[in-house]
């Protein structure tokens, strides 16, 4: 079976939560016999196709942007051409240009949309985009939400409940670098033996300005890994508040990130807006057995982190509540250890890449069978899928 994924950006050009989901999905479904290709846009000059983790990556030039919406004239032809060769076209939403490209390329193959997030911030543009968005979502064969929380709370998905299902994101720990003793020693010396960790792109909805406000009056080390649009403002805020115990590391290699995930006392994830639909770095914390602190925003973050069980969940945009959660975990190491152990157990039960891959491969098969029952009867394009645990 051949699956074409379409998203605005991907490895090696960018590293983010959705890119990690697509990567894990491709790695997992490849093991089940799926041939994956990712079509994305890039600003790089060298756009030769590459192989990455066992799947193909094809990049088209990013020509221009409208309200942060990446566009490519060449991608229209590429999508039309590559869709003809695919058994299933897998779209990753939101990306308004993708909706337009779907119609302009006249894609006539089984289609699935991974609905990664509502569009939250661009209110003015959203009004103009609404008709295209709903025409696109109505036209595809299946929509997938990453958590029951998001499916229940999204007003957009409520219109498409009859063709929407939940397949949770999953991670494969074996795809992460192993523990490097030298890097562990380096970071232990640099940040100390006990610290809270945040990992992610420094965006407006990550709530890091709230975390910095919560850190005022505490002396607990907090390590913030990543870069992004809010980096300068956050560093200025930390300096203004005199937060000498907060370390901004910038972008790090995966080996360093893994070392910090191994060493961290707990994971702080203060995202306060629905743009944070799931939280891959929160799931990474669970995978590494860390107690978590997150906010209740009606999304997948509270499906990963169960208040009082795997960590603490506080109201969004509430520095005092966040400060209290940091203090509770810091002052109760036995509680933190127990929560971390339960977080890892929940990851193993619900969030492995094997489960995600099995769910999506079964969906691909279902879509192909509905579109071409004769081929399905002959076994063309289908693979055997083990039952999800």
Q: Which residues does each predicted region cover?
A:
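N-terminal strand-loop element at the rim of the active site
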Residues: 6-15, 21-69
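A conserved mid-protein helix/loop that constitutes part of the nucleotide-sugar donor-binding site
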Residues: 20, 194-217, 229-235, 358
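Acidic donor-binding loop of glycosyltransferase active sites
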Residues: 87, 196, 262-277, 290
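Short His-centered aromatic/hydrophobic patch
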Residues: 91-98
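A short, active-site helix/loop in glycosyltransferases that binds the activated sugar's phosphate group
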Residues: 138-178
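Nucleotide-activated donor-binding/catalytic signature segment of Leloir-type glycosyltransferases, i.e.
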Residues: 235-255
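Short hydrophobic beta-strand element within catalytic cores of glycosyltransferases
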Residues: 287, 291-295
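Conserved acidic donor-binding segment of nucleotide-sugar-dependent glycosyltransferases
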Residues: 306-308, 312-319, 328-333
């Amino acid at each position: 079976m051949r699956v074409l994924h379409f998203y605005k950006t991907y490895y090696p050009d960018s590293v983010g939560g959705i890119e990690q989901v697509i990567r894990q999905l491709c790695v997992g479904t490849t093991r089940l016999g799926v041939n994956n290709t990712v079509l994305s846009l890039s600003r790089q000059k060298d756009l030769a196709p590459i192989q990455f983790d066992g799947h193909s990556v094809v990049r088209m030039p990013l020509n221009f942007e409208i309200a942060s919406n990446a566009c490519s004239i060449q991608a229209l032809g590429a999508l039309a051409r590559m869709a003809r060769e695919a058994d299933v076209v897998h779209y990753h939403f939101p990306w308004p240009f993708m909706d337009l490209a779907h119609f302009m390329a006249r894609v006539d193959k089984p289609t699935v949309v991974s609905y990664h997030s509502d569009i939250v911030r661009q209110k003015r543009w959203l009004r103009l985009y609404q008709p295209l968005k709903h025409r696109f979502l109505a036209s595809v064969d299946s929509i997938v939400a990453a958590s029951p929380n998001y499916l229940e709370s999204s007003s957009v998905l409520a219109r498409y409940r009859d063709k929407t299902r939940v397949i949770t994101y999953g991670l494969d720990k074996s795809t992460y670098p192993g523990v490097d003793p030298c890097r562990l020693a380096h970071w232990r010396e640099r940040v100390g033996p006990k610290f809270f960790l945040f990992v992610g792109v420094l965006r407006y909805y990550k709530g890091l300005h709230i975390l910095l406000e919560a850190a005022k009056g505490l002396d607990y080390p907090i390590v913030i890994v990543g870069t992004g649009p809010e980096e300068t403002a956050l560093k200025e805020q930390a300096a203004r508040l005199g937060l000498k115990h907060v370390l901004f590391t910038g972008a790090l290699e995966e080996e360093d990130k893994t070392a910090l995930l191994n060493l961290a006392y707990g994971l702080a994830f203060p995202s306060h807006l629905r743009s944070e639909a799931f939280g891959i770095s929160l799931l990474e914390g669970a995978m590494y057995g860390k107690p978590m602190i997150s906010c209740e925003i009606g999304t997948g973050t509270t499906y990963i982190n169960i208040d009082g069980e795997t960590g603490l969940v506080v109201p969004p945009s509430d520095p005092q509540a966040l400060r209290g959660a940091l203090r509770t975990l810091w002052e109760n190491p036995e509680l933190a250890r127990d929560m971390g152990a339960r977080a890892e157990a929940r990851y193993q039960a619900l969030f492995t890449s094997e489960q995600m891959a099995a769910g999506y491969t079964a969906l691909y098969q279902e879509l192909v069978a509905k579109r071409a029952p004769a081929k399905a009867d002959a076994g063309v394009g289908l693979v055997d899928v083990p039952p999800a645990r």
